[in-house]
């Protein structure tokens, strides 16, 4: 050990002699720092603790001395050779990953259960993941390859059957599952296992064919029975008298029979071309059969004869009957009120309106019947479901309730009650139309006025004992004429005054609005606002007319800071050319002189600041 220390001192002296230029301050500091570090190391401690250091001569130097580093390298090589001779799973793991394998297993267990069953096999440091491919030894590489194959084999053993599934295989399995279900169904219904084609069905005897159709297509028998029963009915309706009801029945029955014939054609087509065809339950034609059957049921309940004859003659008869009825009504009213000319004229207007309403009602009834016929014709078309623009899934129950309500409305439209209710609504509107405005007071009827006058006279006679004596005569037509002449004049004046006031108010408002618009165009709205109208109201001003609000005009650039800065930069770029020369792309063509002219007093150079 002393020799080693002396060797170091000798080499440092030799290093000083080799350096001919001497040391500067930086090299001197670095050399002192190295000496301090060597003194604090384990080599320095071992030199101090060794007793033989005093006995050995410092000048003695070993020939071909071996450093401690070389010895450690040789020892490592020997250890690696020993490990190569006996390299088990744990040793290979340590060599690959740089740490011992932590297992609780006994050494007698198989080597295959040593690594993959350990959850802590992977380390958490960088050295355990990098540099594993840089192997110098072939034996270690073989061990690693062997371990990788073993892990791969174990991984394949742990794979489940679902991991190997492919889409095509899954489809085949679904198909086989369907075939199995069909086999079970046939076994439960005691059918043959062989597939039946159209030729097999045709070759069957009547009983076997009926059993097959009754089992596979249970709707076939009742539909064929209805078709045979209703076909003669269709011919009868064709030959019967032409009116609206028979026409509706013919259209409804034709659509129903046509849908049944479509069912037969689709059934034959599927039996010819589709091997997997087993049922017609999910086909859209079944829904159409139910719809057309319901329409035919409702149409069959209509009466066979139409009471009102069609054509121009029937319409003239109707109008003649209505006019005769209205003339009777008019004569009765004129006899009851001979003197009241205005009331008679107004009642004439009401009667004319009733005539018009009755005509309109008849037209609406015709339109309603046409609409129903149109609906029956449209029901034969294939109705595509409407796709909503915002298909949004709703998690609430209210949407389902709304769908149910919509379906109820659609079902109501298919019935004749819907159209009769529409007619009733028109009748109610007509009665509401005769009521008039609530603001205008009603004229008192003659009978009500007489009763009111009698009650007032009776009350006056009861309270006023000193009143005039009444004669024994009954209340006659002269008293009626006197009371009517007294009351009608004041009532008519008040009635007309209220009506005139409302009309004048509407006219004045329209004129004020027109004047305000004209004044706004000419810019004289302030002058118009100063003038007060006859009802004490001023005209509208500019703020009310334009309705721009209270907020002032604001710049739109303040809403977007990026746009604001961009416009500010563009404005500064325009001003920059007036301050200093800006390069704008160089000379475009041949030199044509200074385009702006040479100005003697203009200086565009930039002055540098210190």
UniProtKB/Swiss-Prot annotation:
One of its GO terms (biological process) is endonucleolytic cleavage to generate mature 5'-end of SSU-rRNA from (SSU-rRNA, 5.8S rRNA, LSU-rRNA). Residues 1-23, 40-133, 331-411, 451-511, 548-578 are annotated as: Disordered. Residues 484-500 have a biased composition (Polar residues). InterPro entries: Sas10/Utp3/C1D (IPR007146), Sas10_C_dom (IPR018972). One of its GO terms (molecular function) is identical protein binding. Keywords: Cell cycle, Nucleus, Phosphoprotein, Ribonucleoprotein, Ribosome biogenesis, rRNA processing. GO terms for cellular component: nucleolus; nucleoplasm; nucleus; small-subunit processome. Residues 46-55, 451-463, 501-511 have a biased composition (Basic and acidic residues). When overexpressed, has a role in the structure of silenced chromatin. Overproduction causes derepression of gene expression at both HML and HMR, as well as at the rDNA locus and at telomeres. Belongs to the SAS10 family. Primarily required at the G2/M phase. Essential for viability: involved in nucleolar processing of pre-18S ribosomal RNA as part of the ribosomal small subunit (SSU) processome. This is Something about silencing protein 10. It comes from Saccharomyces cerevisiae (strain ATCC 204508 / S288c) (Baker's yeast).
């Amino acid at each position: 050990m002393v020799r080693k220390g002396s060797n170091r001192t000798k080499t440092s002296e030799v290093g000083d002699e080799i350096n001919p230029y001497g040391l500067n301050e930086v090299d001197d500091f670095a050399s002192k720092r190295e000496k301090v570090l060597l003194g604090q190391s384990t080599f320095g401690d071992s030199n101090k603790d060794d007793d033989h250091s005093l006995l050995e001569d410092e000048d003695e130097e070993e020939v071909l001395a071996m450093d401690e580093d070389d010895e450690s390298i040789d020892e490592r090589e020997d250890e690696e050779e020993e490990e190569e001779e006996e390299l088990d799973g744990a040793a290979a793991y340590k060599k690959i990953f740089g740490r011992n394998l932590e297992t609780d297993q006994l050494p007698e267990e198989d080597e295959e259960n040593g690594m993959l069953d350990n959850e802590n096999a992977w380390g958490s440091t960088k050295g355990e993941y990098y540099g594993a491919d840089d192997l110098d030894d072939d034996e270690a590489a073989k061990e690693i390859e062997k371990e990788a194959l073993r892990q791969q084999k174990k991984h394949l053993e742990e794979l489940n059957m679902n991991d190997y599934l492919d889409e095509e295989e899954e489809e085949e399995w679904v198909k086989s599952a369907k075939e199995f279900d069909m086999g079970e169904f046939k076994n439960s219904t005691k059918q043959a296992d062989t597939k039946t084609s159209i030729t097999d069905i045709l070759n069957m005897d009547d009983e076997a064919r009926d059993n097959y159709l009754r089992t596979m297509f249970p709707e076939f028998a009742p539909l064929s029975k209805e078709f045979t029963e209703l076909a003669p009915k269709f011919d009868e309706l064709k030959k019967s008298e032409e009116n609206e009801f028979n026409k509706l029945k013919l259209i409804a029955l034709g659509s129903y029979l046509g849908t049944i014939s479509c069912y037969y054609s689709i059934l034959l087509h599927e039996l010819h071309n589709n091997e997997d065809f087993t049922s017609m339950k999910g086909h859209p034609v079944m829904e159409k059969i139910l719809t057309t059957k319901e329409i035919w049921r409702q149409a069959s309940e209509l009466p066979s004869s139409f009471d009102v004859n069609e054509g121009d003659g029937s319409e003239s008869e109707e109008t003649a009957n209505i006019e005769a009825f209205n003339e009777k009504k008019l004569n009765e009213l004129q006899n009851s009120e001979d003197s009241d000319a205005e009331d008679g004229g107004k009642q004439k207007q009401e009667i004319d309106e009733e005539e018009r309403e009755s005509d309109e009602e008849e037209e609406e009834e015709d339109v309603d019947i046409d609409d129903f016929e149109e609906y029956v014709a449209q029901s034969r078309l294939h109705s595509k479901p409407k796709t909503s623009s915002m298909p949004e899934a709703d998690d609430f129950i209210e949407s389902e309730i709304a769908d149910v309500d919509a379906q109820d409305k659609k079902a109501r439209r298919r019935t004749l009650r819907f159209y009769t209710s529409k007619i009733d609504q028109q009748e109610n509107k007509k009665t509401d139309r005769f009521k008039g405005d609530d603001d205008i007071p009603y004229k008192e009827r003659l009978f009500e006025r007489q009763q009111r006058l009698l009650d007032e006279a009776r009350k006056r006679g009861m309270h006023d004992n000193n009143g005039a004596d009444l004669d024994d005569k009954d209340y006659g037509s002269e008293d009626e004429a006197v009371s009517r002449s007294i009351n009608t004049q004041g009532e008519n004046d008040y009635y007309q005054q209220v009506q005139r006031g409302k009309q004048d108010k509407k006219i004045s408002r329209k004129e004020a609005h027109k004047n305000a618009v004209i004044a706004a165009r000419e810019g004289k709205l302030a002058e118009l606002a100063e003038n007060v109208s006859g009802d004490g109201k001023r005209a509208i001003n500019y703020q009310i007319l334009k309705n721009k609000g209270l907020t002032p005009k604001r710049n739109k650039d303040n809403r977007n800071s990026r746009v604001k800065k961009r416009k500010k930069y563009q404005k500064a770029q325009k001003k920059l050319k007036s301050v200093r020369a800006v390069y704008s792309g160089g000379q475009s063509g041949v030199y044509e002189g200074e385009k702006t002219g040479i100005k003697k007093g203009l200086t565009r150079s930039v002055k540098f600041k210190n």
